[in-house]
Amino acid sequence: MTVHNNSKIGLIGQNVLFDEVKLIDDGLMDKFILDIQNHIANPTKKSAELIANVRCWSSWLANGIKIEPIFNGKKKACSFIPWPLSGLLLLSSRITGQQPEFEYAADYVLRSGILPDQELDNYDDLSKNIDYIRSIKPLVAFHDFDGNEQGFRMTHLAMERTSNMLIENALLAAEGVDIKENLEKIELATMQSNQLFNAMWKVSEPLLYNKEVRIFIQGLFGNQGSIYPEQGLFFENCGDIFNENYDSKGCYLSNLHGQTGANSSYHPIADEITGVGNHTHAYICLLYTSPSPRD
């Protein structure tokens, strides 16, 4: 579905992704509803993975058709999600508790790359870090499989891989087990994450970030009234609002936030478990107290 598919032009580059999505069999929605009913009656790991996969890949397709016009000379994105993709995305999002918008963890990075079997022994060598990031293969992409998008996304995936050490030792430290040793391992994990982060602009051109990377993950919030209509996205057959442009009924969703690596909980966890958060106050939630009613 990419703009560039290695040496070929992908579906977005050919401006045919929307047309291909409209060919999806309506029967998939009926089948998915049955799958969900079976999962509710008898939940299994396999049935849960099926629902998560539908959520992930329907989100990829929806995001692809949204941005397709931009890469084909248009100033406006596509704001129409056709049936049954619209139903698959909304229902799977509801079941998994996700927003029906592209998400950093579930879609863009963590579920869409194939990690090599072996990690590096350490991350002190920048050139090895670059090779390691380039060895991570994306399952799907919007712009390219081996260029700026691959570099940006797979840098984040490599960083998240080091979180195994962070989470394991944070839990042990919180339980009071070998606190000094576990805090040192947390420090090591965050250092490795930062070492990989330092390779990002070696594998992804910063001047092309907005054009080839950011545009796919920026969401509706702040973009309605510009590249998207004021009403937001229209999901066909998911409501009773009539859309004259597409001669169909559905519903609008608006102000959905896009996501980037800043949505990862990795470094907030590290800051809180080490006490850094006490000094930065970055993650303190200020509670709102309503004024007292007048006598």
Q: Where would I find each of the regions flagged by the language model?
A:
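Non-transmembrane, amphipathic alpha-helical segments
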Residues: 46, 147-158, 178-181, 185, ...
